[in-house]
Amino acid sequence: MEKFRTVTYEVHNPKIKKGVRFAVLADLHGSIFGEENNTLLKKIQEYAPDAILLAGDMVVRMDPSTLETARKLLCTLAKNFPVFYAMGNHETKMKAKEHIYRNEYLEYQAELKQKGICFLANEKNKVVLAGNSFVVNGLELPLEYYHKPFSPKLTSEKMEELMGKPDPEAINILLAHNPKYGRTYFRWGADLILSGHYHGGVLRFSRHVGAISSQFIPFPKYCCGDFYKNGKCMIVSAGLGEHTVPLRIHNPRELIFIEMKP
């Protein structure tokens, strides 16, 4: 059976009136933990988050069986929790017009929407959780921003073109799958940024240091762990799964829990 660890971060923000809890899933890639993902479900249910945030890549673009794995898991979670789903590069590729499994992906997305899951593709959703006003923003980057090894710079202007501006009256969460552009995300002004994509850098040396990114950048700046700047926080998950080359060294799969407090 696949194994994972839980990592809990405590994030303080003066906009918070009352403590709120989040569970963050990134890079599931169709992984299964226990029968019907019961081990993963139990951990989340025991934590009892106020909402579940998906930072992309729940599926593998060339493996349609991962759609069913993710569908079962997310439909179960949606019965008890609000779920917000931002796109990773695998979702973006899978729903492209020319993709062989586009129809299967669109059916998957349609069913999850029917179950109440909020998909955010350069969209935002206002929600009140534990008496706090949040805006959950889901960034979907064009695929050229995932090119290996070179991808364009994400400017502040492009970021605003894709996402608009954050709401100054609310607590802004940004679900942004690719952590390469962490500097731009901080400048944009989200209170909490959640990313994945790098799978912890394959070989993880410490809380924040991994060997290589998914775009073959050695020792990427925002590889894994928590980062802070001007009162803002960015958390990069090492992910719950992997694809193509299932290699992890000193780098366990992880489920993220976040406690936001005043």
Give the residues covered by each predicted segment.
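N-terminal membrane-anchoring alpha-helices
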Residues: M1-I16
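Conserved catalytic scaffold of divalent metal-dependent phosphoesterases
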Residues: K15, L28-G30, E91-L192, C223-P262
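Short extracytoplasmic
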Residues: I16-L41
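Residue-level marker for buried hydrophobic side chains located in beta-strands
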Residues: R21-V24, I52-L54, Y85, L174, ...
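Active-site glycine-centered loops adjacent to acidic/histidine catalytic or metal-binding residues
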Residues: D27, G56-D57, G88, H177, ...
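Core catalytic region of metal-dependent phosphoesterases/phosphodiesterases
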Residues: E36-V128
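Short hydrophobic/aromatic-enriched beta-strand-loop microsegments
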Residues: D191-H199
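Short, surface-exposed loop/helix-turn segments at secondary-structure junctions
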Residues: F205-P220
